[in-house]
């Protein structure tokens, strides 16, 4: 009736309440071709709840209204990748399911068998937990609980479970294209997590050397199993955060600990990224560029958008009518297409961008209509079809299982973000995955930039080339190396779909690459010359006894090390032999160094030392000779002197003075 159709209003029943046709499947959605969307772009979907839903009797239909396999509907409409979450043992001691799709290995294998019939690739998403693993909770599997304080046993557990599971998927004919080692591990995994009650953050896990080493050991154990079982599969590490600084710090921890992976992945939900699609997409581009700078491919591991703000099964949805950012796009199939279009255009603008996975795009109610909430709850308790089931009580935290003292588990909390209506009919937005494709199959060539010994000297470059075509590229220019004949132009040919590796040998310059140094130095020896460049053109600048910032170090082929000197203002001065200087403090730290707690009463005994307002040596007019103060802090300045910060008894700051000027009094 609301859509302009003639109905008998006296007998009309709200379809959201009673489970009839909501009209969503009839809403149009316009899809445009995307310039960089190829047949090989990852157009994936997580359908982990499918096995549980199927057991409960849920049916899916094609666009002709014919009942058919969910995998066939997805395949026929352009979805080429399926993501499956894997939990170790999502049941309690009575064998009752925790819900959430009941995603043990057996449930995943059922999906894999069906996907194999339609030549769809799989991404295996290892949570290394018995239930939901996310930034808030990363619980050790029950069977591993006894080992959680034994790092070596835990690494073996991770390795064995990963390897055994992959082999089982291979045995049913699964085409494993990607393996995700850990799920949304922003704050840690396997119970190595921040103590939120103490205000701890990811910095206390990934930023803590001991914790990071253990965590990276677990990642490396899982990755080792992947490399051994399915060497062509791409290893993916997944953070929920879109924060540039946070992602960069965590990637640094992985690099320091030698974690070998191929793809950096993020969760990208626009309703949690702010109220501006422009800002969210700019953030997405920054994270993709971050992955590129580290020589990694990039993919969105989870995304979605709303088909409606309505609830269709009696369990409150994650995003509903009161959500602040639910209007970034329209809440209908066209809004879903628009959200996917913007995201894919951003993702595929870089050659390291693979594509994305739509999260739980088919998690519809078992029985549509929120008046059927009890039936949906019962089905969840029996088959695990809801986000959680009664069997998870006592295992999953009460603050998640209950809301205002009432059970919050039962049905799907995602039914208004699917690409199907509540009765299993596809929405027009599903056609995005087929209709947006504008190119044929692609080859992704990973260019490894190496020296003559095969050592990588620069971040891996990724180039997409359409199969059967050629593409001209410009090789990267960077300090210390150059390609053969200094020719930076290269032509690549697409010969096969998939990922291949090609090495490009660079020659080292005599000076070599610029190595970050970043110390203040004082030139203490006159016999060494200052040079404008490494062609040994001398500089006339007088540097003896002066202090500079040495930003970079060069290990020259002549056996000497040279420093690139800069003024404090950042102006380049020249290159000088490292033996000519005395190293002072780090350029990232103040010249006076750290403030050490001192806390002693002192009396000024000498008049020859000046009092300063700051360490830029601005003199104070305050008369302090023969007066008594509290020296709260002591500084070891890189000029060789020690200074004290003086305060009055009432706590007022007075100034800084050389420690030789005072006498400690009791």
Which residue stretches match the model-derived regions?
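Substrate-binding cleft and catalytic face of glycoside hydrolase catalytic domains
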Residues: 73-233, 240
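Glycoside hydrolase catalytic-domain groove-lining segments
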Residues: 70, 230-234, 242-324, 341-348, ...
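Conserved "repeat-terminator" motif of extracellular CCP/Sushi domains
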Residues: 441-444, 449, 492-512
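N-terminal carbohydrate-binding accessory modules
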Residues: 7-77
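Conserved, mostly hydrophobic/aromatic
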Residues: 45, 74, 125, 179, ...
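Aromatic-rich peripheral "rim/lid" segments of glycoside hydrolase catalytic domains that contact
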Residues: 23, 308-339, 357-441
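Beta-loop motif signature
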Residues: 452-457, 511-566, 585-647, 652, ...
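Surface-exposed interfaces of beta-sheet-rich extracellular modules
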Residues: 469-494, 555-564, 639-645
């Amino acid at each position: 009736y609301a859509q302009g159709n003639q109905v008998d209003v006296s007998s009309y029943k709200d379809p959201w309440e009673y489970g009839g046709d909501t009209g969503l499947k009839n809403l149009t959605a316009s899809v445009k071709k995307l310039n960089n969307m190829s047949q090989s772009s990852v157009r994936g979907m997580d359908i982990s709840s499918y096995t549980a839903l199927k057991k409960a009797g849920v049916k899916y239909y094609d666009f002709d209204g014919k009942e058919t396999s969910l995998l066939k509907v997805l395949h026929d409409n352009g979805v080429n990748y399926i993501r499956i979450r894997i939990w170790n043992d999502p049941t309690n001691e009575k064998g009752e399911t925790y819900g959430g799709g009941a995603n043990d290995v057996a449930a995943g294998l059922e999906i894999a068998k069906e996907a194999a019939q339609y030549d769809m690739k799989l991404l295996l998403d290892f949570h290394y937990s018995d239930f939901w693993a996310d930034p808030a909770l990363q619980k050790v599997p029950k069977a591993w609980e006894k080992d959680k304080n034994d790092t070596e046993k835990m690494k073996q557990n991770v390795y064995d479970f990963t390897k055994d599971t992959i082999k089982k998927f291979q045995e049913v004919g699964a085409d494993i294209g990607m393996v995700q080692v850990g799920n949304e591990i922003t704050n840690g995994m396997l119970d190595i997590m921040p103590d939120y009650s103490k205000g701890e953050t990811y910095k206390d896990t990934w930023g803590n050397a001991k914790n990071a080493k253990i965590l990276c050991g677990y990642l490396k154990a899982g990755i080792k199993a992947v490399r051994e079982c399915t060497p062509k599969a791409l290893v993916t590490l997944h953070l929920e955060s879109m924060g540039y600084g946070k992602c960069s710090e965590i990637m640094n921890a992985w690099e320091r600990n030698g974690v070998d992976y191929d793809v950096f992945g993020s969760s990208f939900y626009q309703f949690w990224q702010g109220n501006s699609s422009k800002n969210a997409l700019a953030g997405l581009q920054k994270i993709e560029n971050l992955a590129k700078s580290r020589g990694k491919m990039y993919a969105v591991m989870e995304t979605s958008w709303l088909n409606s703000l309505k609830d269709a099964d009696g369990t409150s949805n994650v995003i509903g009518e009161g959500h602040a950012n639910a209007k970034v796009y329209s809440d209908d199939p066209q809004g879903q297409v628009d959200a996917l279009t913007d995201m894919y255009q951003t993702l595929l603008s870089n050659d390291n961008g693979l594509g994305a996975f739509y999260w739980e795009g088919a998690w519809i109610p078992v029985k549509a209509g929120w008046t059927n909430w009890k039936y949906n709850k019962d089905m969840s308790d029996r088959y695990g079809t809801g986000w959680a089931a009664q069997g998870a009580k006592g295992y999953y935290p009460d603050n998640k299982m209950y809301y205002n003292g009432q059970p919050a588990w039962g049905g799907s909390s995602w039914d208004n973000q699917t690409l199907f209506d509540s009765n299993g009919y596809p929405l027009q937005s599903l056609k995005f995955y087929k209709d947006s494709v504008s190119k044929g199959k692609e080859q992704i060539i990973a260019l490894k930039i190496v020296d003559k010994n095969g050592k990588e000297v620069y971040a891996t470059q990724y180039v997409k080339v359409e199969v059967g075509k050629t593409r001209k590229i410009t090789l990267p220019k960077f300090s210390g190396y150059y390609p053969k004949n200094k020719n930076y132009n290269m032509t690549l040919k697409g010969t096969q779909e998939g990922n291949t590796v090609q090495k490009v040998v660079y020659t080292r310059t005599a000076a070599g690459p610029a190595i970050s140094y970043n110390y203040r130095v004082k030139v203490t020896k006159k016999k060494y010359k200052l040079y404008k460049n490494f062609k040994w053109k001398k500089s006339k600048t007088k540097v003896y006894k002066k202090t500079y910032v040495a930003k970079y170090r060069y290990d020259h082929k002549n056996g000497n090390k040279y420093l690139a000197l800069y003024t404090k203002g950042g102006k380049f001065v020249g290159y000088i032999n490292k033996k000519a200087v005395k190293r002072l403090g780090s350029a990232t730290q103040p010249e006076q160094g750290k403030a050490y707690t001192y806390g002693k009463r002192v009396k000024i005994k000498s008049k020859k030392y000046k009092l300063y307002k700051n360490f830029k040596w601005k003199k104070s007019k305050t008369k302090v000779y023969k007066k008594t103060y509290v020296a709260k802090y002591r500084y070891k300045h890189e000029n060789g002197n020690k200074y004290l910060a003086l305060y009055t008894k009432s706590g007022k700051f007075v100034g800084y003075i050389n420690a030789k000027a005072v006498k400690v009094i009791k």
